[in-house]
Amino acid sequence: MGIRRYKPTTPGRRGASVADFVEITRDHPEKSLVRPLHSKGGRNVHGRITTRHQGGGHKRAYRVIDFRRDKDGVPAKVAHIEYDPNRTARIALLHYLDGEKRYILAPVKLRQGDTVSSGVGADIKPGNALPLRNIPTGTVVHAIELRPGGGAKIARSAGTSVQLVAKDGPYAQLRMPSGEIRNVDVRCRATVGEVGNAEQSNINWGKAGRMRWKGRRPTVRGVAMNPVDHPHGGGEGKTSGGRHPVNPKGRPEGRTRATRKSSDALIVRRRKQNRRR
C-alpha cells in the first residue's frame, strides 16, 4: 500500500492524502458473504443517544470475516484482495478446494494466487493459522484468540502484530503492540504475519467532511456548552468545568477502567504507563 497526496487546489485538499489501493484486485464483495448493516446513529431501542459522535456516513454492507480459521487440512487459494469499509485492514477472499469461500484479514506479503491453510500441520508463512503451541518462538502473529475456539480478538487492526516470545506449560507469552506481555492458552489459534495496510495510520483526512462520510460526528467539549446541556457547561468566561470529567448524563468519563480484573492474573509485564502532565 502507498499513500497518494493531493495538490492544494482547495482548503480541504491542502495536506490531505488517500490510500492508492494498488493492492485491491476487485471492487465489489462476494455476494454470499455480505450481510446488511443497519445504522443505529449511536441510539438505543428507545431512541436515546448512548454513544456520542456517531451518525450519518455512507451506507455500508458487512463482510463476514472468518476469525476462527477452523477449516483444517483444506488448502485455499487467495482469489482476491478487497477493500472493507468496516475495518482498517484489507481482506482476502479465499476459495477452498472443496468449493467453500471465506474472508480473512489480509496480512503483509499475501498476494492474489497464494495458497493458505490452517491447522496443526500448516507451514509457518503469512496467512496460515495454527495453534500457538505449534508456532516457533519469535514468530510475529496476528488475529489471536483469547479462548480456544472463541475467534480472534487481538491484533486485528491494520499494521498491528504480536510477537510470540516464550512458551511455559499451558501458556504462551505474547508481546502486545503496547509492550505488555500476556499469557494466552497455547491451544488458541493465531495467524502468521502482520496485518497489512500499515500505512493507513499516516493518512491525513484533510477536512471534517471526510470524517462525516465515515459516520463520525463532531466532538463538542462540555465546557463549551450551556448548563442545560452538560454538567461542565456555563460559568462566566472560560472555566475548567470545576469537577472530574463526566458525560452529559453526569457519569464519570475517561480513565474509568476497573483497577482489578480477573484477566489481570494473565499479565506477565504491564505496558509502560504515560505519566499524566
Swiss-Prot record:
SMART domains from the xrefs? Ribosomal_L2, Ribosomal_L2_C
- A GO biological process this protein is involved in? cytoplasmic translation
- InterPro entries in alphabetical order: NA-bd_OB-fold, Rib_uL2_dom2, Ribosomal_uL2, Ribosomal_uL2_bac/org-type, Ribosomal_uL2_C, Ribosomal_uL2_CS, Ribosomal_uL2_dom3, Ribosomal_uL2_RNA-bd_dom
Give the compositionally biased regions (Basic residues): 37-57, 268-277
Look up the domain of life of the source.
Answer: Bacteria
- Is the keyword Ribosomal protein assigned to this protein? yes
Q: Which parts of the sequence are annotated with region: Disordered?
A: 35-57, 222-277
Gene Ontology CC terms: large ribosomal subunit
Cell division listed as a keyword: no
Which keywords are on file for this protein? Ribonucleoprotein, Ribosomal protein, RNA-binding, rRNA-binding
Output one GO MF annotation.
rRNA binding
Quaternary structure and partners: Part of the 50S ribosomal subunit. Forms a bridge to the 30S subunit in the 70S ribosome.
User: Do you know which NCBIfam families this protein is assigned to?
Assistant: rplB_bact
What does the sequence similarity comment in the record state about its family? Belongs to the universal ribosomal protein uL2 family.
Q: Which PANTHER family match?
A: LARGE RIBOSOMAL SUBUNIT PROTEIN UL2M (PTHR13691:SF5), RIBOSOMAL PROTEIN L2 (PTHR13691)
> What job does the chain carry out?
One of the primary rRNA binding proteins. Required for association of the 30S and 50S subunits to form the 70S ribosome, for tRNA binding and peptide bond formation. It has been suggested to have peptidyltransferase activity; this is somewhat controversial. Makes several contacts with the 16S rRNA in the 70S ribosome.
Full protein name: Large ribosomal subunit protein uL2
Naturally occurring in which organism (per UniProt) = Frankia casuarinae (strain DSM 45818 / CECT 9043 / HFP020203 / CcI3)
